[in-house]
Amino acid sequence: MENNRNFPARQFHSLTFFAGLCIGITPVAQALAAEGQTNADDTLVVEASTPSLYAPQQSADPKFSRPVADTTRTMTVISEQVIKDQGATNLTDALKNVPGVGAFFAGENGNSTTGDAIYMRGADTSNSIYIDGIRDIGSVSRDTFNTEQVEVIKGPSGTDYGRSAPTGSINMISKQPRNDSGIDASASIGSAWFRRGTLDVNQVIGDTTAVRLNVMGEKTHDAGRDKVKNERYGVAPSIAFGLGTANRLYLNYLHVTQHNTPDGGIPTIGLPGYSAPSAGTAALNHSGKVDTHNFYGTDSDYDDSTTDTATMRFEHDINDNTTIRNTTRWSRVKQDYLMTAIMGGASNITQPTSDVNSWTWSSTANTKDVSNKILTNQTNLTSTFYTGSIGHDVSTGVEFTRETQTNYGVNPVTLPAVNIYHPDSSIHPGGLTRNGANANGQTDTFAIYAFDTLQITRDFELNGGIRLDNYHTEYDSATACGGSGRGAITCPAGVAKGSPVTTVDTAKSGNLVNWKAGALYHLTENGNVYINYAVSQQPPGGNNFALAQSGSGNSANRTDFKPQKANTSEIGTKWQVLDKRLLLTAALFRTDIENEVEQNDDGTYSQYGKKRVEGYEISVAGNITPAWQVIGGYTQQKATIKNGKDVAQDGSSSLPYTPEHAFTLWSQYQATDDISVGAGARYIGSMHKGSDGAVGTPAFTEGYWVADAKLGYRVNRNLDFQLNVYNLFDTDYVASINKSGYRYHPGEPRTFLLTANMHF
């Protein structure tokens, strides 16, 4: 097992490798940069170059006023061109271009994750996903049909967005009307009955007005999985007034409907590290893996969601150097699902005979009926000016936000046991019925922030930012009385069994101060070194709207707990080489997280935990030649618990669901005017799994390589085809595993996708 956990370059120590990288990258980058420069009379002249479609030069968020190459943070921008070339139809697929980021966690116990359940640098980042800089709530899968680019920022983002995950954030930028007319359409077919169509129409009306319409429809089965299906439709109309003038108004609407059959995973029997949970079930030690096509749900399982988002943004250029923006957004995400998952402990196994083919496991029904809403108004001012000889690049603003969540209580669903090796899904437990035992959460936030980049000299910059959030969270929860099991309560006198009884009604208010500071020095016109330090906080219940009374021992969201706090240090270098077509970056980072809530041996919670994530990351994005494009990166990260209860299955202090080594690279080459070829590979190293007392489950997932390829053919200016092949060598791997380790999701096998792209 130890060899499986080692990346091929393990013999290089992290710090030695990074130091050599930073020292070595400078002369190499300088030599490459010189190709785009000419020298006359000792005057440096940089030739103009065409920006790479694989390396957007600027964040679309006005809070990041500097180019990506001059931002003192690790930032990856995944462009629309990369998304199209790879056929990435959802956010999770797009994030495969960022090393160490992915949906590695499959849920706790019988509960399973849904949607974009993203982990980044040792932390759950699924509640730190933003659209146009505004929080997007909901455990749904986000389609890319209306996405211009995806921006991934590693390290604390509390100064940028308020409460957020301690190790990073993800910002999806929506498509907007532009000042040219055109139509792009695509039709795709592929493995597992994949069918998808998209339409993108932009039409100019007059001199300063344009409308845009994006439409998407998709139906598919999950490749390699029986019964698992996905179906979604989306429409995104928008209109812009005043394009090319000092006053611009954008009106946007997004509607997405999804009807999916969720996947609760399959048993880990037969995986490396698995052993039977008891002596009486020892036959499972040599009975072999289950068929990865097996579906352990029921024909009644479903995952339905509806997203509606309306946005109005007004921009006014006060002068050539100063712009004020005001954005108002209302959004609602409703999700309703019934998902079946197996329970793999020894007490859950029934053995009618000695033949394991007759054995069954208990099933549990995971249910959710939730509505998330957000209403926000945000004003931002950006300005560039001088005070004496010092230049300023300022971004400041205020935000008013109300977020609400209602979890509707539903009556429990009872399911029969399922055969371990030959599951039968022809079970119809019926749909969900509400019982009135709801949980309601609401958070109101007022925030004010200011960022400034100071140009001290031609080569030296300082930057800093501060954000103050004043928040107020209210939460109430009810339980249907007279039930059984964990969390059950008795019915008060005169109250009928099954009636909702309020068990929690509390509130929490407070202030959060987040800040960041950095410095950057240009070694040459094209390269720099930088340092950065950032502080980010998240209060109890900050990611799920759930609170518990002060002093209550059985909740991690007590109102008397302090906010979680993350401190990140980063030192790095960025180089624009080859006529500024290619961006090379390298960074060394450390994040310390404190005020972590830990569960004690008796099941109560205390706040004394500390975690640390440290390592280095290198990346590349852009054009090596005008015809050769590339995006990729490598990270080595060590995530450990410095103080608190060890949560890894093997008893170590390692944080689970965090690969120590991760690599990704995608490259595309325009061989002729009409033919393009692309190929990519990614590596996810071995990961520790969490622990909840499960016996015999794997402590690790094994590392794996996956390769993809693409062939493109241009028929004429109006039509081109592309063939994408995923998992080219049909690698068998564990994509995600749940906390107990009884269930996992197998990686997608080799699949094909043929797309016709039309342009008018």
Q: Where in the sequence are the language-model features?
A:
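Acidic, small-polar-rich N-terminal luminal/periplasmic segments of exported/outer-membrane proteins
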Residues: 41-180, 571
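Structural signature of Gram-negative outer-membrane beta-barrels, strongest in the C-terminal barrel
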Residues: 240-242, 372, 391-393, 399-403, ...
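Outer-membrane beta-barrel translocator/receptor signature
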Residues: 146-148, 159-237, 243-248, 308, ...
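C-terminal beta-signal and adjacent terminal beta-strands/loops
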Residues: 683-692, 712-760
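Acidic/polar loop-and-plug regions of large Gram-negative outer-membrane beta-barrel proteins
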Residues: 218-223, 235-317, 335-372, 413-445, ...
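Gram-negative outer-membrane beta-barrel transporters
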Residues: 587-592, 606-694, 729, 755-759
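Membrane-embedded beta-barrel scaffold of Gram-negative outer-membrane proteins
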Residues: 315-319, 323-329, 333-339, 530, ...
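Face-selective signature of the C-terminal outer-membrane beta-barrel domain
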Residues: 310-332, 363-478
